[in-house]
Amino acid sequence: MFSFYFNDNKITKLLMVGYGSTGKSVCDFLANFIDITVDISQNDDEFVNYDLNSYDLITVSPGIPLNKSPYRALTKFKDKIVSDIDIFYQYIKDTKAKTIAVTGSNGKSTVVTMTDFVLKDLGYKSILVGNIGTPALNKIGEKFDYCVVEVSSFQINLFNCVRFDLGCIINVSPDHLDRYQNFEQYKQSKLNLAKFSNDFFVYDVHNGIKYAGEYQIIRGAIYRNSTKLLDIVETKLFGEHNLENIIVVLNILDRLGLDINQAIDSIKKFKGLEHRCKIVKKVNGTTYINDSKGTNVGATIAALNSITNSKNIILLLGGVAKGGDFSLMIKSLDKYVKYVYIYGADKEYIESYIKGYCKYQLCNNMKQAFELASQKANSNEIVLLSPACASFDEFSGYAQRGEVFQNLVAQLEQKS
């Protein structure tokens, strides 16, 4: 066994703040080294008992709110703070593997998953890590040609020395305003990814930054210069937002020097993400769509704008709002939504934004919202779960919320 070094400095004492999946991956990795003491702070009361000056390094889980007491104290030790991705980078930087980082408010999970899928379909060894669910250090022993990393603004705030071969920002809209002073601060946290990337681009249709290389969207298809490359109907996806996601993937592959025509064939096979605008079933003429991964206002707006051309959506909305500005969805609600059922911890907060702009009802929980929606829905209408909120008031995560929705649809079908 060997001692643990970071930036050529021997580390003998490390504090781990937070012990979720990321913290556990760091702890498991460090178990391979000798001569290092690791202390773990799992809650506020434990944290205040540690002398931060006494540690060589401090790893912080992305879920730790650095803007709130007692964790504000960490801001004085920025040079000591490292993320799990910094540690991962230290141990792969001398290999030939290429690293790609993608951040954004909406679309990043689809982009990284599609990129990883295409790379594998083209015959490369690719790993997909980061905010999407698999901590980078869990893959440290694998051999790979490409490492695709989904990064959140919280993770970027913790970066120390990582250098990605390519960084990309897509579609930044207000989110996590419970962790940032305002939207500008949140947006800047995303843009900071450029500081840790050798090559970098932004594709943000919401803020008018449409770097697209030679690509453009015309009547539901992607063109390169004047040549049509791909029509949305040739894919297993739907909606203009997915054409935008594909353009980002094509730009990533372009910058990696890969064959775009071969990539197009791979993209046609990509089935999309679970819990992201997935049609569950049609029951009694009503289509039920699971977009549980829509955890902020921007994501729900994208779903509303892509699913239909009629005012035939019954929307299930609610959970933990994270300070979101629900007034931004009023235009889409007016155009596409027949009725809204609002549920969850912040239902009154959401109501304060949309009251007077649409028909709605407050519900106790998602199950009640579903039951009322299924009773109201007529043939050729859509019941859409796109909550625009986090789920942890009622569920363990967006995946469980989506699974519960799917089970409710299955139960409804059995009764029909």
UniProtKB/Swiss-Prot annotation:
Gene3D superfamilies (alphabetical): Mur ligase, C-terminal domain, Mur-like, catalytic domain
GO MF entries: ATP binding; UDP-N-acetylmuramoylalanine-D-glutamate ligase activity
Pathway the protein takes part in: Cell wall biogenesis; peptidoglycan biosynthesis
GO biological process, one term: cell wall organization
Enzyme Commission code(s) on record: 6.3.2.9
Residues the entry annotates as binding ATP: 104-110
InterPro entries in the cross-refs: Mur-like_cat_sf, Mur_ligase_C, Mur_ligase_C_dom_sf, Mur_ligase_cen, MurD
UniProt-listed Pfam families: Mur_ligase_C, Mur_ligase_M
Substrates-to-products reaction catalysed: UDP-N-acetyl-alpha-D-muramoyl-L-alanine + D-glutamate + ATP = UDP-N-acetyl-alpha-D-muramoyl-L-alanyl-D-glutamate + ADP + phosphate + H(+)
Sorted UniProt keywords: ATP-binding, Cell cycle, Cell division, Cell shape, Cell wall biogenesis/degradation, Cytoplasm, Ligase, Nucleotide-binding, Peptidoglycan synthesis
GO cellular component, one term: cytoplasm
Subcellular locations according to the entry: Cytoplasm
Similarity comment text for this entry: Belongs to the MurCDEF family.
Record's function text: Cell wall formation. Catalyzes the addition of glutamate to the nucleotide precursor UDP-N-acetylmuramoyl-L-alanine (UMA).
Protein name: UDP-N-acetylmuramoylalanine--D-glutamate ligase
Source organism per UniProt: Francisella tularensis subsp. holarctica (strain LVS)
Lineage: Bacteria, Pseudomonadati, Pseudomonadota, Gammaproteobacteria, Thiotrichales
Gene: murD
